[in-house]
Regions:
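Bacterial Sec-dependent N-terminal signal peptides
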Residues: 1-27
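Acidic, glycine/proline-rich Ca2+-coordinating loop motifs
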Residues: 18-185
Length: 185
C-alpha cells in the first residue's frame, strides 16, 4: 500500500514539475536578449595589440595531412603565457600545427612585439601541439618546452626544449637534457 502511495506521489511530482510556464517578455536577469549582460572583455584589434596569429590548417588527401589519415588533425595547438625576460610582464607564445610558432614580447599596455625571428623558436619545428614554460636549468629564466606530434614520421616528432639565453632568444637543447621524446604528445 505504501509503495502505491509513493509511486502516485512521485508521478504527481513529475507531472506538476513539467507544466509549461507562460513566457515573460519583461526584462529580468535571465532574459539576456532584453537585458544583455555587460561584458568585462573588450576586443582589441591585432593592429593595436601587435598580436597576429592564426593556426591555419590545410588538409591534403595526397599526404597524411588530412582527417582520414590523422584522427587528431583538427585538435588545434596551444598557447602559453609567461614572463620570458623577467620584466614582470607576461609574454605570449602560440604553437602552430602547419604554421610557425610565434612569440610575442609584452611591452605593457596590451601592446606586444613579435620577436619570433630573433628568438630562434622554430628550430627543428614540425607539427607543434602544445607549450609549457619551466625553468629547466634553474637559472631564474623561463625556458620553453614544445610538444610535437602530427601526421609526420616519428623521427620528425622530437619534442623541443628551448633554453632561454637571457637576451630574448632561445637555443634548442632537448637532446642534451634527454627530453627529445618522439611519442605523440
Amino acid at each position: 500500500m505504501l509503495k502505491n502511495y509513493l509511486i502516485l506521489g512521485f508521478t504527481l511530482l513529475v507531472v506538476i514539475s513539467c507544466k509549461e510556464e507562460p513566457s515573460n517578455s519583461e526584462p529580468n536577469e535571465l532574459n539576456h536578449e532584453l537585458n544583455p549582460i555587460s561584458s568585462s572583455f573588450k576586443k582589441i584589434q591585432s593592429s593595436v595589440s601587435g598580436i597576429d596569429f592564426n593556426n591555419t590548417i590545410t588538409h591534403d588527401l595526397n599526404t597524411k595531412f588530412n582527417l582520414f589519415d590523422y584522427d587528431f588533425f583538427y585538435n588545434g595547438a596551444g598557447v602559453g603565457i609567461e614572463d620570458i625576460n623577467n620584466d614582470g610582464l607576461k609574454d605570449v607564445f602560440f604553437t602552430g600545427n602547419q604554421v610557425p610558432n610565434k612569440l610575442y614580447l609584452n611591452k605593457g599596455g596590451l601592446k606586444f612585439e613579435d620577436i619570433t625571428e630573433t628568438a630562434n623558436i622554430n628550430t627543428n619545428k614540425n607539427w607543434s601541439n602544445g607549450i609549457t614554460f619551466a625553468d629547466v636549468n634553474n637559472d631564474g629564466w623561463m625556458d620553453i618546452y614544445i610538444s610535437q606530434g602530427g601526421p609526420v614520421d616519428e623521427n620528425l616528432r622530437n619534442n623541443l626544449l628551448l633554453i632561454n639565453q637571457k637576451d630574448n632568444s632561445f637555443k634548442e637543447e632537448a637532446n642534451q637534457y634527454g627530453l627529445n621524446d618522439t611519442g605523440i604528445s
